[in-house]
Amino acid sequence: MEEEIKSLINVGFLTIISVSYCYCLPPRIKSGVLRLLSIFPVCVLLVVLPLFFSFSIFTSTTAFFLSAIANSRLILFSFDQGPLFPLPSNLFRFTCFTCFPIQRQQNPKSQDHLSTYVFPVKIAIFVVLLYVHNDIQNLPRTFLLCLHPLYVYLLLEILLTLLRILMTIILGCDLEPHFHEPYLATSLQDFWGRRWNLIVSASLRAIVYTPVRRVCQRVMSSDYAMLIGVFATFVTSGVAHEVVFFYITRAMPTGEVALFFLLHGVCTVAEVAAKRTAFVRRWPVRPVVSWMFTIAFVNVTAGWLFFPQLIRNNLGERCSNEISLLIDFFRSKLFYFPQ
């Protein structure tokens, strides 16, 4: 346990030094390839930092916050794009917008009242699922595979929403939500583009989709360029998730996670193309029907391709044990009274 805490301190120190460098020197360099080259060593370091840990909770958090979020924002910053442009007023704000999955709200007046009222219900459901966790393990495997997406969604929504509330108080500005009720999605395009993990979607849109579409438009029609941009985004997301899963499990990639995103990429492209046909425009699918098919497809494919690798490596049990060790460690340090 002490080694993990030491690694946490070292990673924190290296991150602060690296981000401070990015705040001070690269902005003095003209945006473009030269600024990207000046930031490149930091990007490499941020990719390596998750390997400092053996605990999966530290590894996954570092991989998401630093290897994914921070790297994508520094790359965009190299070209005067993203949340870091224009340059934040001080180093603290620059560090927060670099390392945390937060983004200034474009339209602060638009408040999602549904999410505000439903959030306590989500917490209650998650607490109930945790309480009955041991009792439902004997249920059919098919039913459990359907519960895994619910577990992951509620966990991410609760943690990231609490982080957003905290950072809103600290920074004094309205921040974008991370999710927009993904269980209400009526299509794959709606699910991935407008409801699921919106902060990551915005980064992928800026780094992958927009450049690929712009390049492809030079040699083909705008519609085909758009479809290629969508598929390229899913390919990139699949590769990134394979890397994150390697960080967490420390097992050789199986390709299942990448296949999950490739499948969703192909189906999303087909869906977008179908919506543009005269047949679908004339006879549109009823929203309730498309909602049922979308949710069923996401859950079935996630249970088939996304979660098996995590289940085989006992990620849930590992996280529970790690949290118990952390609680015991801090309890012994905080409530230790020498004789």
UniProtKB/Swiss-Prot annotation:
Q: What is its main location?
A: membrane
One family name in Pfam for this protein? MBOAT_2
Instruction: State whether keyword Transit peptide applies.
Output: no
Q: Which GO terms describe its cellular component?
A: membrane
Q: Name one GO molecular function term.
A: long-chain-alcohol O-fatty-acyltransferase activity
Transmembrane stretches, by residue range?
7-27, 39-59, 113-133, 143-163, 226-246, 254-274, 287-307
- Give the enzyme's EC designation: 2.3.1.75
- What does it catalyze? a long chain fatty alcohol + a fatty acyl-CoA = a wax ester + CoA
Recite the UniProt keywords alphabetically: Acyltransferase, Lipid biosynthesis, Lipid metabolism, Membrane, Transferase, Transmembrane, Transmembrane helix
Family of the protein in this entry: Belongs to the wax synthase family.
Summary of the function given for this chain in its UniProt record: Catalyzes the final step in the synthesis of long-chain linear esters (waxes).
Identification of the protein by name: Probable long-chain-alcohol O-fatty-acyltransferase 7
Q: Which organism is it from?
A: Arabidopsis thaliana
Upper lineage ranks?
A: Eukaryota, Viridiplantae, Streptophyta, Embryophyta, Tracheophyta
